[in-house]
Amino acid sequence: MIQFTKMHGLGNDFMVVDGVTQNVFFSPEQIRRLADRNFGIGFDQLLLVEPPYDPDLDFHYRIFNADGTEVEQCGNGARCFARFVRNKGLTNKSKIRVSTSSGKMTLRLERDGTVTVNMGVPILEPSQIPFKAKKPEKTYLLQTPMQTFLCGAASMGNPHCVLDVEDVASASVAEIGAMLTKHERFPRGVNVGFMQVVDSGHIKLRVYERGAAETLACGTGACAAVVVGQVQGKLGQQVRVDLPGGTLTINWEGEGKPLWMTGPAQHVYDGQIQL
């Protein structure tokens, strides 16, 4: 039997598994079965806590989408990860350092119950996103058989393109998201953000996630949207991001500086399951 915890960050929900005290391995097929909301546990991503590979770090953090693919980063998951390792007694630290497949992160448990995550320095160089373009631009043209889209592009350890929309509530997120997530200019696929700028300190956002469709919240998507908005001169240093599942606060001092994300992490229940 495998012990697990169900958690969510603004409705972006996770199955979190302790791979430090348990010996666990998940095949893509098992993950897809567990992610099924009718026949399994149901989740957007599976988060796996592993021992650190580096003695200077506390844990290694792995993320698997509902379709069984392993991905580089998940911001909402990082907040739940921090809350999980503290709740389970795997650490007593309030500042936790972890590695992911895309780099290192610092997670900080705040006194008010929220979690602040140092998401690292955003990547704007196209080849590192990865995105096919000759040089970094504030805005790119993405052509599809149906229409051409204007977008910004950035990586928070995973690739994002961000579209400006007048009204996020009426945006064709499912249709356009499905079209762009596998666009040929993003060799590893892309998460697609739909951003409505309310003012320089406030945006509304919906995100179509690569491998998971639209979710109630996407932490890295919120970060990428603020980066793109700031690069385009539309947003300031601290931005409130309203997602369908709730609100995140993003703070970024500009290019070359790390980005900080603050938001909630909720425990739902503990369970056990036979694979």
Curated annotation (Swiss-Prot):
Question: Could you tell me the keywords of this UniProt record?
Answer: Amino-acid biosynthesis, Cytoplasm, Isomerase, Lysine biosynthesis
Q: Name one GO molecular function term.
A: diaminopimelate epimerase activity
Q: What EC number(s) are associated with this protein in UniProt?
A: 5.1.1.7
Extract the InterPro entries matched here.
DAP_epimerase_AS, DAP_epimerase_DapF
Which pathway does the database say it acts in? Amino-acid biosynthesis; L-lysine biosynthesis via DAP pathway; DL-2,6-diaminopimelate from LL-2,6-diaminopimelate: step 1/1
**Subcellular localization, as worded in the UniProt entry:** Cytoplasm
Q: Which residues form the active site?
A: 74 (proton donor), 218 (proton acceptor)
Provide the binding site for substrate: 12, 45, 65, 75-76, 158, 191, 209-210, 219-220
Subunit note: Homodimer.
Name the record gives this protein: Diaminopimelate epimerase
